[in-house]
Amino acid sequence: MTGLALLYSGVFVAFWACALAVGVCYTIFDLGFRFDVAWFLTETSPFMWSNLGIGLAISLSVVGAAWGIYITGSSIIGGGVKAPRIKTKNLVSIIFCEAVAIYGIIMAIVISNMAEPFSATDPKAIGHRNYHAGYSMFGAGLTVGLSNLFCGVCVGIVGSGAALADAQNPSLFVKILIVEIFGSAIGLFGVIVAILQTSRVKMGD
């Protein structure tokens, strides 16, 4: 068994062991009602959901950007050994990957500016508006984070191919760059959808 397969199996076993332990404890102490999804959604603060959305927006976007830069950068450095001329021109791919992280930062700032304080602590007093705002911010952060994660990987793989193709045949660079531009638009789609998700958000008393 390889190291990666061992890691996956360890995570799988640990997850189900924790789930079993929690289930047994809840059964013994008569806390089974806490498995109720509605209870969980109403007892958690909308601020938790909004902060989770902010964290997911920035963290997943940065992971996507870093992953894409890693994939592209290694190919540029490797191909630049044989064809040094590709190093400067293919930095465009690195910029496209970095733009993915910028999308996440922008959306995190937008979401954080929408979070307004409220004085209520009881679920009924908090109201549907604040819960809707918290869930919308979480959904927006998850949307932009996941779209930027896959966008970064997409741009990184295409940028890697562009660097290696340019090293072999310079006329291929512009053609592959068009594919890379369309790949980078995936992250922009995520930002647009996230803005639409939070367009009706109103939090506060």
Curated annotation (Swiss-Prot):
Protein name, entry field: V-type proton ATPase 21 kDa proteolipid subunit c''
Transmembrane segments annotated in the record for this chain: 4-24, 52-72, 91-111, 138-158, 176-196
Function summary: Proton-conducting pore forming subunit of the V0 complex of vacuolar(H+)-ATPase (V-ATPase), a multisubunit enzyme composed of a peripheral complex (V1) that hydrolyzes ATP and a membrane integral complex (V0) that translocates protons. V-ATPase is responsible for acidifying and maintaining the pH of intracellular compartments and in some cell types, is targeted to the plasma membrane, where it is responsible for acidifying the extracellular environment.
Cellular location(s): Cytoplasmic vesicle, Clathrin-coated vesicle membrane
UniProt topology in membrane: Multi-pass membrane protein
Residue spans, topological domain Cytoplasmic: 25-51, 112-137, 197-205
Residue numbers on the Lumenal membrane side: 1-3, 73-90, 159-175
